[in-house]
């Protein structure tokens, strides 16, 4: 976690953590949507940069991993009677995506950097939430 804390410019506010704990169904729905979006982004990059073998390999691995996580979260939701719905993107992710540059080379770099920030933030948040979640969610 030290590397993640050094990478992120600030910690998630405790108010976000309290709100997430108070509404765990939305937390799970949002997490499933984030996993799906990450997989879709990886697949989109595979289409756009199909002549880049290294990128194809990494994005293929990422898409599979994110879809597996999506499936796992949706299963947890189903076990808890939580209906999957699509939520609008968070302001955090939307704000980061809004600064992605348009020229092709810069756009790829920006998309990868934004993805790294979103993934790091997710890790940071779940590390803080985990001790306060039930056993099944802690293991996930």
Where are these regions (language model features)?
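Non-heme di-metal
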Residues: 1-140
């Amino acid at each position: 976690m030290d590397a993640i804390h050094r990478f992120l410019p600030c910690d998630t506010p405790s108010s976000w953590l309290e709100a997430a704990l108070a509404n765990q169904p939305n937390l799970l729905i949002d997490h499933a949507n984030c996993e799906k979006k990450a997989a879709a982004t990886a697949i989109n990059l595979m289409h756009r940069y199909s002549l880049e073998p290294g990128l194809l390999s990494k994005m293929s691995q990422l898409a599979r991993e994110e879809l597996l996580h999506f499936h796992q979260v949706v299963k947890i939701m189903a076990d808890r009677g939580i209906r999957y719905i699509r939520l609008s993107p968070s302001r955090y992710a939307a704000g980061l995506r809004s600064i992605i540059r348009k020229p092709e080379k810069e756009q790829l770099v920006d998309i990868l950097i934004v993805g790294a920030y979103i993934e790091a933030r997710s890790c940071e948040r779940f590390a803080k939430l985990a001790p306060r979640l039930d056993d099944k969610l802690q293991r996930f």
